[in-house]
């Protein structure tokens, strides 16, 4: 059983190509092209519907499924986008999507942010933060009886940028470099039922 990677993806480009690729994805996921365990949202339906193959040396990765497709919206004058969410085994399948876009929406760009907790896999290609501004993920839980609970001002799962992370940790531990602050946070005494994890998102 794989660990599932959650990916948020944005396709951006000219209105006609954005609307067309969204329409095609909806069309490809309206039926099953082959037997699978995921239903119509299976990524393999997108691969096969687009005229590609999966499996083997040259096949496209498609183990997973689309969970949601957003509406087309305007980003800037003449520039449109829609967002899509999918799960895949262990890591994102951005290469599969890139190949499909090159064929059906060559003027479109793809931005994504992928996270797989068990493998400590957190990446994004959105270096300019057009859609995904977070730089860190806080994964924590402290019991009410923990002495640090009152000071720990983070949600159990929180997306945050480095500047805000440093400011909030400095309020708890005092002024020091971000790496030292993160080390302090990770070393908070916890029970077997508690945890403090800070994941830094890697830019690719």
Where are these regions (language model features)?
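Intrinsic low-complexity, intrinsically disordered or marginally ordered coil/linker segments
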Residues: 1-204
